[in-house]
């Protein structure tokens, strides 16, 4: 009975470790590709003298510094989008939460909050506000293009 219990416990532990390994490996691959993409973007910004990145320590310090910049920025933009969607659902008749005005307000609030909450605190990343506006605007347009607004894409009427 104890041997059976330990065998079952070992099987559960092994399964958990395999799932954890797959999760960590896929996350590492995603972060690697994200890092290469951001490295390319930073090289473009440096080449055209649109940005300056002066934090150069060890690889892990750089990964933590620049990675936290991206992660915190993502959470700010994510929070603004969900808050704006919540307002749109709560106030469907309000003209500010319909059409292009809604998207312009969402984009403006997200960009402004990102700049003042995240960007100004990272003193080793020097990018002008208008460059940040263009980058976030491009990402916002891509989000609208590839993730269109709909209640249910599989619902055919």
Curated annotation (Swiss-Prot):
One of the record's GO cellular component terms: plasma membrane
Compartments where located: Cell membrane
Transmembrane segments: 18-38, 63-83, 100-120, 122-142
Highest taxon of the lineage: Bacteria
Sorted UniProt keywords: Cell membrane, Membrane, Transmembrane, Transmembrane helix, Transport
Membrane association type: Multi-pass membrane protein
Signal peptide interval: none
Pfam families given in the database record: SepA
The family this protein is said to belong to: Belongs to the multidrug resistance efflux pump SepA family.
Purpose: Involved in multidrug efflux.
Protein name listed in UniProt: Multidrug resistance efflux pump SepA
Lineage of source species: Bacteria, Bacillati, Bacillota, Bacilli, Bacillales
Gene: sepA
